[in-house]
Amino acid sequence: MKKITRIGIGGPVGSGKTAVIETITPRLIERGIKPLIITNDVVTTEDAKQVRRTLNGVLIEEKIVGVETGACPHTAVREDPSMNIAAVEELEDKYPDSDVILIESGGDNLTLTFSPALADFYIYVIDVAAGDKIPRKNGAGVCQSDILVINKRDLAPYVGASLEVMARDSKIMRGKKPFLFTNCKTGEGIDDLLRLILDMALFDVTTNRPLAASA
C-alpha cells in the first residue's frame, strides 16, 4: 500500500481551519491529487457536516469523516491520538489510492501541535481579528508548525491590527519557516498556500493527472 501523506491543520476556535480545508480541497483535486478529510469536534461532528455541504459535488461525503473526541482538542491529536489514528487507518483502508489526508483539530490554544504518529506535516492557522500580538506570544503552534497561516487579513483595519507587525513578529518567532496571509472568503493567498503544501508536503505526488469533477 502506498504512503498517504497526513497533514494536520490546527489553530484557535474560529481562526478559519475549516475554511482553509474547504478552499484548498478543490484546488488539490484540480491538480489530480486525491484528498480525504477528517475533522475533530469535542461533542459534535458539526465541522464534518459543514465541509460535506460546502464540498458537495467536489468530494464524496464518505471521504469526509467527523471525529467526536470528547476530550481536549490537543489531547486528541497529540497526547492520545488513537481515535484519529483509527479514523485515518479506516479511511486509508477504504480509499488506498488517495494521496493526502487533511486532519483538522478542534479549536484550541496556541500550544497545539500534532503527534508525529498522526501527522507527517502540520499547518497552524491564526486570524488577524485575534490581534497583532498573537505571533509574538511564543505558542508552539505558531513557532513549530511547518506553515503558519495568518487568516482574515481583510479584517486588519477593523480591529486595529497591523499586518506589518504580524509579519515582523512571525519572522522573528519562526526563523526560516514559511508563513503567509490569507483571506479564505476571497481566495487571496490560497494559491500561495497550495504551492507551499505541494512543495513541502506533497512533492512526491504526481500532479499531472486528468482533472476530475469529483473525487
Curated annotation (Swiss-Prot):
Compartments where found: Cytoplasm
One BP annotation, GO: urea catabolic process
A Pfam family per the record: cobW
GO CC terms: cytoplasm
Molecular function (Gene Ontology), one example: nickel cation binding
Keywords: Chaperone, Cytoplasm, GTP-binding, Nickel insertion, Nucleotide-binding
TM segment ranges: none
Subunit architecture: Homodimer. UreD, UreF and UreG form a complex that acts as a GTP-hydrolysis-dependent molecular chaperone, activating the urease apoprotein by helping to assemble the nickel containing metallocenter of UreC. The UreE protein probably delivers the nickel.
Annotated family: Belongs to the SIMIBI class G3E GTPase family. UreG subfamily.
Stored HAMAP family: UreG
Functional note: Facilitates the functional incorporation of the urease nickel metallocenter. This process requires GTP hydrolysis, probably effectuated by UreG.
Name of the protein: Urease accessory protein UreG 2
